[in-house]
Amino acid sequence: MNNIYISLYIFFISYIIQLCFNTKYIYCDKKLYVSKNILPSVEKKEFVSNVPHKLEWLVHNILEVVHFLEDVNNYIVDFKKDILTKLEHIVQDDTELYESYEYNENLLNQIYLNNEKKLKRYSEYIEKLKDTKLQMFEDTINNFQRENIYYLNFVYKNLLAKIDLITNLNKKKLDKEKKKNVIELKEYLEDLKKRMFDMQKRLNDIIITKSTFLKNESELNMKLFETSAIDYVNNNSNFEVFSTYIINDFMLNKKRINVLNYDSNLFFKNNFMYFNFLHNYLKEKKDEHVLNVYIYLKDPLIQEYELNYFNYYVVLDLYILDVIIKNVDLLIEKKGKKRKNVNHILVCIDNYVVKYNVLSSNIYLDIQQDIKSFFHESNRNVDGSKIQDMLFHFERKNNSIYQNNMFHDKYYKKKIKKDIKEEKKQNDSLQKYNKNIDPLLFIRKKNIFFDSQKEYYKKFLSSYTYEEIVNILCNKSSRCNNRIFQLINDVNKNTFILKSHLALKNELKKFFQINQNKLLKNKTGVGLINSTKDDINRITNMNLATNTNNAMGNITNDSNIINTNNNNNTSDINNNNTSDINNNNTNNINNNNTNNINNNNTNNINNNTNNTNNNSNNNNNNNIFNNEDSLNKCSAYTYPFSNDAEKNYQENRNQSFSNSDHCFKLLNSIQGANKSSDFINMQNIDDYLNTYYVAYHESFKVVKKEHYYSVISHIFESYLNIDESSNDDDHPIHKKYPHLKGRNVSINFLGQLPEIMKVYKTFRYCDSLNVLAKSYIPKSPASVQSLDKGEDNNDNDEKGESGEDTQVIEKDDSGEDRQMIEKDDSGEDRQMIEKDDSGEDRQMIEKDDSGEDRQMIEKDDSGEDRQMIEKDDSGEDRQMIEKDKSRDDNKAQNNNSTDNEEHDEITEQIGFLKNHNQKYMRLFQKHLLEEIKFINFFEFLVQKKLGVILEKNEFLKLYIFYGQKNLPSMPYTPLFFTCRTIIKIEVLRDVNTNQIIYSSRSFFLETLITLKEYKIKNESAYIVIETTDESSTIKKRLKMDMLHKISPMSHINAYVISNKGKEIVYHKGNIYQRSASDIKNVISDIRNDFLNIILPQYHLFDLFDNYVYIIICLKNENC
């Protein structure tokens, strides 16, 4: 600052000096100016007074300088203050910048830490992804190697065959030109052979170089997997957190109805067995009895199309659940149990087919070769030594299986010696057969559900379950029912069906639950294992109606499978809403409002088609609740797994087991309950063990896939939100669904059916599906005609009130239904009893050929179609004119009524869905109608013996049809393709040689396997094999004119026709073809290939359905 002041002072001094100098100059200038211009007198005066003027001027100038200096000083002071203020602002800005710098530094540190964590997670994810990709690459290389070896061998064999053909031609006397062509062809084929070998060598080199790397990576993968498994056993993994979350939401939820969706959870699907047995049976609350409803959806499509009915699903609404619970309660009531003991129901929704299982799905086991020998016909004599041999074999088999179990090392070493001793005491039965059994074998049986990756459960079901079956059937003694093993062998040579149904299931579940409780205690370190009698009694109390399956098996033969919503109270709601029960069977209503389920009054009138007699005595004799005499006679056979099984065996050994054939027939021939809506009726239901069908009902809702879970949740949430008061029993929803009242229901969506839950399709299964499909088709001929024409009108529901539908209903009551009832009374049960002894499939085929199908076809030919024609000639046009006259007047009113129609649903959204449900259902009915017409067409041809060959045995029915002029459209709906396979073969007649060219046997085999792969993936399809001409350029280039005369050059194509369109799967050359001179030879070759070579030699019985249709036609002539 001092320097600034000094500089300013110097500046001012210099300025003053300069000012003085300028002032002097001005003065002198003035002086000169005066001397020139003013007068002499004045000049004298001024000269005299020069000094005073000069002083005044100096004073004036000094004053001005002083004032200027004061101003400058003030300016400097102000300038100083301004500079100081600016300096303060600069300091404040510096402090703020420093604080922002610190804040940004902290923020950058946090971002760095977060990024570091993300990088760690990404690195872990990339490592896992690398492992999976390596595994996929390894599998791809292996599959590629197998396929290439197969095709190389195949092409090599065909090349050898062609070379042999050329050598044979060389032996003949040929022209020089022909010999030259043959030599050139031979050289070409040899060159091709060398190229193929070079390709094989290169492929082998690639595989060898990559195999070491893949082997090391797979070993590393296995080590990581084993460490994760050991971590899980030691409670060191995240799996426990995941399972805990599921249990908290799955079991401990306080809501009465809980809707969950596990559709996208692959881990849950893969570990289905583990979750099903361990979580749901071990960790549910002991003081609550939750009704677990497991729902499996079958999705037939991978890609969706908007105008396809496959997009839509039946919603599991309150009606379906109420029907299921009602049937389960009745089963429990018959067994004498309480409803709270039932807590497991499996529901499968297969698009529009709704079926459910009590407890769990059916158990079907493939017999392995080493086990099959025990059930061979030559070894039917069952004695104590054979039982011991079987059990010893099973134990040895289990030991070999568990040696590869990943849990057997560290986990089993945690067993305490006291536990092992206690297990030995509790399991003396194991020591009876082999004293050298590993004591840890008993514990190993529980870990079979952990290893879904290695699929140990398949071996487990084929060996361990047999051991349990033999222990149960033989009561752990040397005495065993000989008839049981005969039944096992008679059912099927390749499939072992558990005949004991729920009884065996309950025994297995009891074993699983008791022993897995022990596993859980050992894992959590609770202490010693104590299988007390309380545990056994608690499990025993959870047994269901263990032996009602066979009695429930053949309930009815009704073509309209309807389970009406029956109410036990007076003022039955069914009489108020008969149109809402079912349009297909308006007679299926209990007209007695005061009926109780357990009341056997003679006034219990039921118009169901299953009721063959309204007499109360016959009702009591046919009712499974009251038919105790016949059951008591077979008590030892019917209840071989109860606590008194040994006593029953001693008392009834001569009476029961010697008459086991009669008892088995009796249990399969007991009529269903004659009370209204006691059970869901289905023809030949015993093939499903405990499976029941719910046919089409008006209360069913149809929704799109993306809305399925939200609609389900909305339905049940609305039911939960109903205000419960003291008079909640009077609520209309509770009246409509009385069986849901007070139930703890947990609904769990498990996605698609797991691999373990497969159904073995029999003829009865196919017939049941056929009858179920017919229940969806309207009975009104006008409705059927509108479906044929594809009309989408909603007038069919209004026609139900007119005389037209009334006539059809009267016809059904007097004609069709009466015939079916007479058939049920006179022939069905008798045929079933004879069928069990001698010829199951044979008599059933005769029945199909002569009985049911014949009546249906005659009805279609003489009855229904005739009435439709008469109606077209006489009255339909007139009725249509009258309806057209009134349609314009009522059109707006009908449209408003459909939107604003009153409904009895719990929400407006579901009512809207119900009112607009017809268009989707009509599209589905149209598909089913095409399917039924296709089936009836072939049955009609078989009866009339017109242009079709029928081959039938115990496994399948093969229809071979030549020509396609009158063939109906070939459907590919899921319901149809669960039982039937369609193969269309288009053969070609060569113009030059007049030979008929068709596919070779190897191509036929490959095509059939490909078709089955599509069907296994739930892609409904049928296959077309066609022979096409090939352009002549290839023939000229290869100079094969001579060979063309012997074997024409053509291509064989195979197309899969499905709901996704037409997709080519094979395109082969002439090495895959053969020729014949007559179409009869073609048909004979294809029949021989399919029946005598492909099926028996390649063991493909399980690959194909029971009904196979092979349609043969000549291309460009009758295709």
UniProtKB/Swiss-Prot annotation:
Keywords: Coiled coil, Merozoite, Signal. Residues 1-21 form the signal peptide. The keyword Coiled coil applies. The keyword Zinc does not apply. Residues 606-627, 782-905 are annotated as: Disordered. It comes from the Eukaryota. Possible candidate for an effective malaria vaccine as determined by epitope response in sera. Residues 170-206, 890-920 form a coiled coil. Disulfide bonds: none annotated. Residues 788-891 have a biased composition (Basic and acidic residues). PANTHER family: THISBE (PTHR37458:SF1). This is Uncharacterized protein PFC0810c. It comes from Plasmodium falciparum (isolate 3D7).
